[in-house]
Regions:
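Preference for long, amphipathic alpha-helical scaffolds in soluble/luminal domains
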Residues: 1-327
């Protein structure tokens, strides 16, 4: 067995579980997988997250890169493989389904300052920089065939253009819009929209506009010295490895784009992959280069030692690129 895999399996239960299914290709029915998953579900950290999420939608979101907000904790638990039927998950899903707009978008509570065109009040609304993440999480949690998911996906696709997703918000937010030109795609909205739709093959594989939107993100990488739509730069901070995947950075972009098979040999994508790869240490482990205060108690919330979760995430991306089961 590869030495990296041996090390990952010694890590937290969620890393062992994801390593076994994502890198080793083991089945959910395998005893080792089932054991790791059971151990994951009884960990205090996981129980605490599920308890917090039971109060969805929780406190108002005031900035979309708030890594401690329930929105990002929802994405995190869904990425771990937690799903319908696990203790506490059905209540979370019920709360999310109760907060879906008439047009299909899942809603959160947000508070937009009047300085940015908002009301300064807590409102149940949606924006294209949050609702795709809820759709993504719901699919990952095992709700893909639910009518609410079909409605949310149709709504999301309807807002896309040939070059991505613009800054669009619920009508209740009035004139609020991000700091960019109206005709520009929002890099972050485009990223998380693609992330959600990549989980639904019938959408991922059938819409030319989705394929062209993946190219938009690669063009932004090509033109990173000239273009910064909606103030999303792709410089030094963008290239720092950090997890959880909350904002617009190299790990998040690669995690999404490598889920589109037609891109895996694209030179622009490979350039980003190579920038990521050279950050490995001699053992092929990866260490966080930037951290998020809300996650400082987790093993990836420090910059001094290699992170199990970050190392897993990088090697999972590399496996998609090589197409090899080399573990």
């Amino acid at each position: 067995m590869n030495e990296v895999i041996k090390w990952l399996i010694e890590g937290p239960p969620w890393v062992e579980y994801l390593t076994r299914i994502g890198l080793l290709g083991q089945q959910e029915s395998d005893l080792e997988v089932a054991t790791a998953r059971h151990r994951m579900l009884i960990q205090p950290e996981i129980k605490n997250l599920l308890s917090e999420l039971s109060e969805w939608p929780g406190p108002a979101l005031k900035r979309h890169n708030d890594a401690g907000h329930l929105l990002h904790k929802l994405v995190f638990i869904s990425d771990l493989g937690i799903r319908v039927g696990d203790t506490g998950v059905d209540r979370i899903i019920k709360r999310i389904l109760e907060n879906q707009s008439q047009d299909g978008a899942f809603q959160i509570t947000a508070n937009i300052s009047p300085q940015y065109g908002g009301s300064g009040r807590d409102q149940l609304v949606w924006m294209l920089c949050d609702t795709p993440s809820i759709l993504y999480s719901m699919v990952k949690l095992g709700m893909r065939e639910h009518p609410a998911i079909h409605s949310a996906a149709r709504h999301l696709v309807s807002l896309g253009t040939d070059n991505g997703w613009p800054c669009v918000v619920a009508s209740e937010l009035g004139k609020f819009r991000g700091p960019g030109r109206k005709t520009d795609p929002c890099p972050y909205a485009t990223l998380i929209a693609l992330k959600a739709l990549a989980q639904i093959p019938e959408w991922r594989d059938s819409k030319p506009s989705i394929r062209s939107s993946t190219d938009t993100l690669l063009k932004l990488w090509e033109q990173r010295k000239e273009r910064r739509p909606y103030m999303f730069a792709m410089g030094t901070d963008f290239a720092k490895l950090k997890t959880p995947m909350v904002w617009y950075d190299i790990l998040h972009v690669l995690e999404v784009l490598t889920q589109f098979p037609h891109l895996v040999k694209d030179a622009r994508l490979i350039e980003m992959v190579n920038i990521m790869k050279i950050k490995a240490d001699e053992q092929e482990y990866f260490t966080s280069e930037s951290t998020r205060k809300a996650w400082s108690n987790w093993e990836f919330g420090q910059k001094k030692a290699p992170s199990y979760l970050l190392t897993l995430q990088v090697h999972r991306i590399l496996k998609r690129i090589t197409g090899l089961s080399l573990y």
